[in-house]
Amino acid sequence: IKDFPGQENDYIDFIRIACHPDKIKETLSIAENLYDKGYEIFVQLMDISNIDNFGYKILEKWTCKNILKSLYCADSYGIITPLDLEKTFIKLKTADYQNISFHGHNNSNLALKNSLTAIKLGAYSVDITLNGIGRGGGNLNAAELLNILNNFSAKHYNQLSEEYAEIFKE
């Protein structure tokens, strides 16, 4: 943390901190310290299918939830089912997390289905990658999600296509 000079003296605006289920408490402490230095903070809970009740209790009791721009749920091994993802979102919403996001891997070909589930549940954001490039089974292919969203009036999709229209043309 000491290597981060503070947002006013840095070119970095935000920091996304990833943590394994056994490091939640330490990660939340780091998040608080970096927030105090002026950074926007995102925390990514990796391997969400293996967060136990103790991990959820730590998340529930944390008193600084409001400092997070978003709390990411990462399906690190691409094995979570849409039903289990829904249960995870409900636990986090019940614990008063406002902006919950999703980062899916496609090992079981569920990245698209899980991302659509997260969107239905009110996800703040879902991660996509070009051609689904990513570790292991890859991540959600941007074209797959954008093709589906193109058929619906997704409120943020138009903003995305307007801002990146030239890139999409290429």
Q: Predicted segment positions?
A:
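Catalytic cores and adjacent flexible loops of soluble metabolic enzymes
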Residues: I1-E170
